[in-house]
UniProtKB/Swiss-Prot annotation:
Enzyme Commission numbers on file: 2.1.1.173, 2.1.1.264
Protein name: Ribosomal RNA large subunit methyltransferase K/L
UniProt xrefs under SUPFAM superfamilies: S-adenosyl-L-methionine-dependent methyltransferases
Domain of life of the source: Bacteria
GO molecular-function term, one example from the UniProt record: rRNA (guanine-N7-)-methyltransferase activity
Species for this entry: Alcanivorax borkumensis (strain ATCC 700651 / DSM 11573 / NCIMB 13689 / SK2)
Purpose: Specifically methylates the guanine in position 2445 (m2G2445) and the guanine in position 2069 (m7G2069) of 23S rRNA.
Record field: catalytic activity: guanosine(2445) in 23S rRNA + S-adenosyl-L-methionine = N(2)-methylguanosine(2445) in 23S rRNA + S-adenosyl-L-homocysteine + H(+); guanosine(2069) in 23S rRNA + S-adenosyl-L-methionine = N(2)-methylguanosine(2069) in 23S rRNA + S-adenosyl-L-homocysteine + H(+)
Broadest EC class assigned to this enzyme: transferase
Compartments where located: Cytoplasm
The family this protein is said to belong to: Belongs to the methyltransferase superfamily. RlmKL family.
GO CC list: cytoplasm
Keywords, alphabetical: Cytoplasm, Methyltransferase, rRNA processing, S-adenosyl-L-methionine, Transferase
Length: 704
């Protein structure tokens, strides 16, 4: 007898291998099917044991007819009374080939009218004799569907999360990497487990249980060609396999959503593998080296970023996965499902193998990666000597850069700092700031007054760039030049370009995105480094609130430090999107780390939540279309009072301001315990300007 096992398009080679391992005689492998020959027992074996098959079809007829007569001809080609069991309803599915016009429902009605009158027609495959037909231009095909309901319905997953993974696809992912084969892997982690399908299938495969061990209904039960005793024997063998214990392998499923994990626990319970799997609410960024054991693999279905606005976040989440594996589990492999090869390659890992498939409307990839060895970041520092010949006019700046570099060298090494300010308008004739971002240099020229000859200003600018290159020994491509002038309102955030070229730098244990092309500001205020690092130290187990959050770098530090919840508030969509990417680059999602686009003052008026740790760094001045403008000198008292209403007893507010003539509202000091930590909060590389910002730790009086 000739049978066809169907699968997702692109997985037929994997299915063919699986059927061969079951002792099935494969005769043909297509893109979405595998043909095999054998007896009824072989067909039942595939139905019960194959984890990759979607359906098992018995070929009944192929007729050389056109679609206008095909339904009646197909119906007339079979002795239905000898094919269908007594009183069994018939479930029919007819599909049209791509070139066949017309409604397939009309073809189905014509087929049904041509069947013997005693047959009842059912809309449901369960409990029915299932017939499938396909009409092409010059051919018509007829099959008996021995599976009935699709075989991915194992019986344990009654509900899924936001993007549930089909069981057959999960099994194909695992089969691709040889999961369950002796000596291949001793551990499996799914950091995006959702409702648990991948890790549950991994447990069932490791135990050697039949895919259909828990299923009670198949299409072949209503087929006269299947003897009842044959079915009972096959069912008994499959059922007994369902009692096999899961061997001693490490199986872990992590997810950020508690409700989804609850589904995973319920599904694992129904599958009989609950005690074999460790499920935990934890985000990718919270995985530690101890979570990985030798000879393991990470499998997962990370967010694809199918919507355009989600694509950057998905890419940075893949980046985080690659970085985490390279640092914490360099011996692991990663087997990932995705829809965009470019997004998946953002992981930075080495691509070992891939499979292409069609998953409903999506073109998908299964990709096997291995981590790349993590190389230390190259942080540019002042060189002891230089091959550059600088103009005489640039020599004073070169000397000052070398002096500053020598002063900062030991501090930079001791504190392990990648991003710092090397020079800040120390010399009147060089009105620039020089910031180092790992292996890149940002030179910010403060626009010369109109009284200065433009040609002279340009010459000084060129000298500055030459001196920087000579002092640091960098190529021209590593130096980024910007011109700043006195800003009004939100002009400091004005767009310069639209290249979207983000780079990653490290601060403490956090990975932060900077942009040296598109905006005047890079996305990271270097002078707040000590405060951000303190937030990371204090955040464990706390609820963190970040107001006027900009790109959310403080939020990232809180998340990396173990905050149980964070809320990030800013009025700019652009910077909240940036914050989302910052979180993703560290392995955190916006499920547990809320991003709120809102006016901060109004958001505080409506806030009902309490926080243990708050960071607020308001601008000196901010335009607002929906209310009066925000002026920090006038409004900071009201702002702080609103924040303190949301601050839990025992909590602390870190309030910062870069207004040079700032003076704290006296009423704040009367009502709250205010500690001026400005001197502590200004790092060594900014000590030349003690008014770069003011910073205060504010607590409730009873906590002081």
């Amino acid at each position: 007898m000739e049978f066809v096992a169907t699968c997702m398009p692109g997985l037929a080679d994997l299915l063919s291998d699986e059927l061969g391992s079951l002792g099935i005689s494969v005769t043909e492998t297509g893109r979405a099917h595998v043909s095999f020959s054998g007896g009824v027992a072989d067909a039942l074996k595939v139905c019960l044991w194959s984890r990759l098959s979607e359906r098992v079809l018995l070929h009944l007829a192929t007729l050389g007819v056109t679609p206008d007569i095909a339904p009646e001809k197909l119906a007339a080609s079979q002795d239905w009374l000898s094919l269908v069991g007594n009183n069994a309803p018939v479930h029919l599915h007819i599909e049209h080939g791509a070139e066949v016009r017309g409604d397939n429902r009309i073809s189905a009605k014509r087929f049904i009218h041509a069947l013997p009158e005693q047959f009842a027609i059912s809309r449901e495959p369960k409990g029915s004799c299932c017939i499938r037909a396909r009409l092409d231009l010059n051919e018509a095909h007829l099959w008996l569907d021995l599976a009935g309901e699709p075989l991915h319905r194992r019986g344990y997953r009654l509900a899924g999360g936001r993007a549930p993974l089909r069981e057959t696809l999960a099994a194909a992912i695992l089969w691709a990497v040889g999961w369950g084969k002796e000596g291949r892997h001793s551990a499996l982690i799914d950091p995006f487990c959702g409702s648990g399908t991948l890790v549950i299938e991994a447990a069932l495969i490791a135990a050697g249980r039949a895919a259909g061990a828990q299923r009670q209904h198949y299409g072949f039960q209503q087929w006269r060609g299947c003897r009842r005793q044959l079915w009972l024997d096959a069912q008994k063998e499959a059922g007994e396999s369902g009692k096999r214990p899961v061997p001693a392998v490490s199986l872990k499923g992590f997810d950020s959503e508690a409700s989804t994990l609850q589904l995973a626990l319920q599904n694992a319970e129904r599958a009989g593998v609950r005690n074999a799997i460790h499920f935990e609410r934890r985000e990718l960024g919270a995985l530690r080296r101890r979570d990985f054991v030798d000879n393991g693999i990470v499998v997962g279905n990370p967010p694809w970023g199918e919507r355009l606005e989600e694509k950057p976040q998905a890419g940075w989440l893949h980046y985080a996965l690659g970085r985490i594996l390279s640092v914490r589990a360099p011996g692991y492999q990663a087997l990932l499902l995705g829809a965009d090869a470019e997004v998946m390659d953002r992981s930075g890992m080495n691509l070992e193998q891939q499979w292409r498939l069609k998953n409903g409307p999506f073109n998908n990839f299964i990709r096997l990666y291995s981590p790349r060895k993590q190389t230390p970041a190259n942080v540019v520092k002042v060189a002891d000597d230089s091959a550059f010949n600088v103009p005489e006019g640039a020599q004073p700046l070169l000397n000052r850069l070398r002096k500053n570099g020598k002063h900062l060298r030991r501090w930079l090494e001791r504190e392990d700092i990648q991003c710092y300010r090397l020079y800040d308008r120390d010399l009147p004739e060089f009105n620039v700031a020089v910031d180092i971002y790992a292996d890149q240099v940002l030179v910010q020229e403060f626009k010369a007054p109109k009284t200065i000859d433009p040609e002279k200003a340009k010459e000084r600018r060129d000298w500055a760039v030459t001196a920087v290159r000579a002092a640091l020994g960098v190529h021209r491509e590593q130096v980024h030049l910007r011109t700043r002038e006195k800003q009004k309102g939100n002009q400091q955030y004005q767009k310069l370009d639209a290249q979207g070229q983000y780079r990653v730098v490290r601060e403490g244990q956090s990975q932060l995105l900077i942009n040296l092309q598109d905006y005047l500001d890079t996305g990271l205020f270097l002078d707040h480094r000590p405060t951000r690092l303190r937030i990371a130290e204090e955040a464990s187990g706390k609820r963190f609130l970040n107001l006027f959050a900009y790109t959310g770098s403080a939020t990232v530090h809180a998340a990396v430090g173990g905050a149980k919840r964070t809320v990030t508030v800013d009025s700019s969509k652009r910077y909240l999107d940036w914050a989302a990417c910052n979180l993703a680059a560290n392995g955190f999602s916006t499920d547990q780390h809320e991003l709120a686009r809102a006016d901060t003052m109004r958001w505080l008026d409506e806030c009902k939540e309490q926080f243990d740790l708050v960071f607020c760094d308001p601008p000196t001045f901010s335009n607002n279309k929906s209310r009066s403008d925000f002026v920090v000198e006038e409004h900071h008292g009201d702002l702080i009072r609103k924040i303190m209403r949301c601050l839990e007893p025992g909590g602390v507010l870190y309030f910062s301001c870069n207004y040079r003539r700032f003076q704290m509202d006296e009423s704040i000091s009367k009502w709250y315990a205010v500690e001026d930590i400005s001197r502590w909060s200004i790092p060594e590389d900014f000590r030349r300007n003690e008014k770069i910002h003011y910073c205060y730790a504010i607590r409730h009086v009873e906590d002081a």
